[in-house]
Amino acid sequence: MKKIYVLRHSKSSWIDLSLGDFHRPLNSRGQTDGPMMSVYLSTRIDMIDFLHCSSSVRTYETSKYFIERIKFIDIQYDESLYHSSSSEIINNIKCYDEQYNSAMIIAHNPGLTNLINEISDISLDNLPTTGLVEINFDCTKWSDISIDNSTVVDIKFPKQLK
């Protein structure tokens, strides 16, 4: 079985308009929701094999909350995840090392919402910031993941934990 945790970055700040989109940090809500969601996930699991994270400032900052509480065997910050389409994200997933059975992806919308809608049997209008979706795939190779072998195990949004 393969397992993916799809997480949209926490809420980012628009205060400093001189910063480009890639460089925007988390705002105060993001700095609250990130730790809250990482605590939630750490009560369910203690390890994920691979963290694949966009290298933008807000995704990097979000990832740190999860790294503090969950063990990752390998971590990769990847600029190609910044505003990737769902098909680009799926292509990345299908190339994950087969030694990994679980992976967390921290990236951006609309790519993540579209990804969830394409590889699972649920339909989301919008994955909110710090929204988490856990999907199991009944297969042994990342290249075999599809909507036909997926099961959504958990969906959690910050507002559900407040």
Give short role names for the model-derived ranges.
Residues 96-99, 109-130:
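Non-DNA-binding regulatory cores of transcription-related proteins
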Residues 44-46, 96-101:
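Glycine-rich phosphate-binding loop signature in dinucleotide/nucleotide-binding domains
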Residues 3, 7-84, 127:
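Active-site-proximal alpha-helix that buttresses catalytic centers in soluble enzyme cores
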Residues 76, 82-83, 144-162:
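Functional cleft and adjacent loop/helix regions within the main domain
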Residues 83-93:
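Short alpha-helix plus adjacent loop in nuclease-associated cores
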Residues 4, 98-107:
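Generic beta-sheet signal
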Residues 122-153:
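Domain-level recognition of soluble alpha/beta enzyme cores
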Residues 62-66, 89, 115-116:
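Hydrophobic packing residues within well-ordered alpha-helices of enzyme cores
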